[in-house]
């Protein structure tokens, strides 16, 4: 616990420093800096409070041990031993809690997300599975009390999606859905398969934290905006005016096209939200190669061999290959009952990070 104790003291020192900074009139006048420092202060508060509890109970243990060495009073000895046992139990519990609190936090965990789902290998069946995944996440979001907004979609003639982009807003969305990044494989008999053979198809899911103004500052001069006429599905509702928008962030080359809404203004607003998130995602990676790898990890190539999870319909089975978890309740999972998988992934992630913390 000694190494952990040193880390905790450093956290407490930083917390004190932050409290001084956010009381400084110069910092208060700079709203972006004040927001950033206040957020950091808030993220450390629980750890510091637990650490203060830990120091207090450790002092109680020390005092009780000293008292037991010095007293000859039987009643006092009995009372002190009882208090000491309780204090040691509390100390052990606080040590466990502090270890978890010291696990490096993902700064994006509290953010809303942009989710991109794409039909990949498997043609029409892959696009139908992309639609099934969309419905699965929609139902899960409803259970969580989150709001889902479709910001872009490209539908197929069979009722699936070549791709669909969602904005999901609510409490700690990224912390729960970030593990959905990757290729999702489905094994089932397609509705178009007359012989009843099981086919394997893939859809990919990409999850990006929504960038806040404090995260990324895009100079308007760095954005090129092109407008064009949107094309409705199958010639339906084709807009005769130039309402579709394509935004290019010149320094990074990131392009976002948006034609989901009827008005250019609405498409501009949605395109900017996605562009900000992609640029933020880009700048989180210091090198171009690291960024490319992250985007590849997030969106996936769609190759059938690259998978994080398999959905086997004939056997009503879902397997998450990263943690070796198999659940025989595919019907419930596709209805949005994702808690068991997501909680298992969070525990596995925390366990790995805790092991790294202990080995540092």
Curated annotation (Swiss-Prot):
Keywords: Cytoplasm, Methylation, Protein biosynthesis
Molecular function terms, GO-annotated: translation release factor activity, codon specific
Ranges in coiled-coil conformation: none
Location of the protein in the cell: Cytoplasm
One protein family per Pfam: PCRF
Post-translational modification as stated in the protein's UniProt record: Methylated by PrmC. Methylation increases the termination efficiency of RF1.
InterPro entries cross-referenced by the UniProt entry: PCRF, Pep_chain_release_fac_I, Pep_chain_release_fac_I_sf, Prokaryotic/Mito_RF, RF-1
Modified residues (N5-methylglutamine): 236
Domain of life of the native organism: Bacteria
Gene3D superfamilies assigned: 3.30.160.20, 3.30.70.1660, 6.10.140.1950
GO cellular component: cytoplasm
UniProt record similarity statement: Belongs to the prokaryotic/mitochondrial release factor family.
Alphabetical list of HAMAP family matching this protein: Rel_fac_1
Reported function: Peptide chain release factor 1 directs the termination of translation in response to the peptide chain termination codons UAG and UAA.
PANTHER family: LD18447P (PTHR43804:SF7)
Protein name: Peptide chain release factor 1
């Amino acid at each position: 616990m000694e190494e952990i104790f040193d880390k905790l003291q450093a956290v407490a020192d930083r917390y004190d420093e932050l409290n001084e900074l956010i009381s400084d009139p110069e910092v208060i006048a700079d709203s972006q800096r004040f927001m950033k420092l206040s957020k950091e202060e808030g993220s450390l508060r629980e750890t510091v409070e637990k650490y203060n509890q830990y120091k207090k109970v450790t002092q109680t243990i020390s005092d009780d041990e000293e008292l037991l060495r010095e007293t000859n009073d039987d009643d006092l000895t009995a009372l002190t031993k009882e208090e000491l046992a309780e204090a040691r139990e509390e100390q052990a519990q606080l040590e466990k809690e502090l270890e978890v609190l010291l696990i490096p936090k993902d700064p994006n965990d509290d953010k809303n997300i942009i989710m991109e789902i794409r039909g990949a290998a498997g043609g029409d069946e892959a696009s139908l599975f992309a639609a099934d995944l969309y419905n699965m996440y929609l139902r899960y979001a409803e259970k969580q009390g989150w709001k889902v907004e479709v910001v872009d979609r490209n539908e197929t003639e069979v009722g699936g999606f070549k791709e669909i982009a969602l904005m999901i807003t609510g409490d700690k969305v990224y912390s729960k859905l970030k593990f959905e990044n990757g290729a999702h494989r489905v094994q089932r008999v397609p509705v178009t398969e007359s012989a009843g053979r099981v086919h394997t198809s893939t859809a990919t899911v990409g999850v990006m934290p929504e960038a806040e103004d404090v995260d990324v500052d895009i100079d308007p001069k760095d954005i090129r905006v092109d407008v064009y006429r949107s094309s409705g599905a199958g010639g339906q509702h084709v807009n005769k005016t130039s309402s579709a928008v394509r935004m290019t962030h010149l320094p990074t080359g990131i392009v976002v096209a948006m034609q989901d809404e009827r008005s250019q203004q609405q498409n501009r607003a949605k395109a900017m939200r996605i562009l900000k998130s992609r640029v933020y995602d880009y700048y989180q990676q210091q090198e171009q190669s690291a960024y490319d790898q992250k985007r590849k990890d997030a969106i996936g190539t769609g190759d059938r061999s690259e998978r994080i999870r398999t959905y086997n319909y004939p056997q009503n089975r879902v397997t998450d290959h990263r943690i070796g978890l198999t659940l025989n309740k595919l019907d419930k999972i596709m209805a949005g009952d994702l808690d068991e998988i997501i909680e298992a992934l969070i525990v596995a992630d925390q366990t790995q990070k805790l092991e790294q913390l202990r080995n540092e």
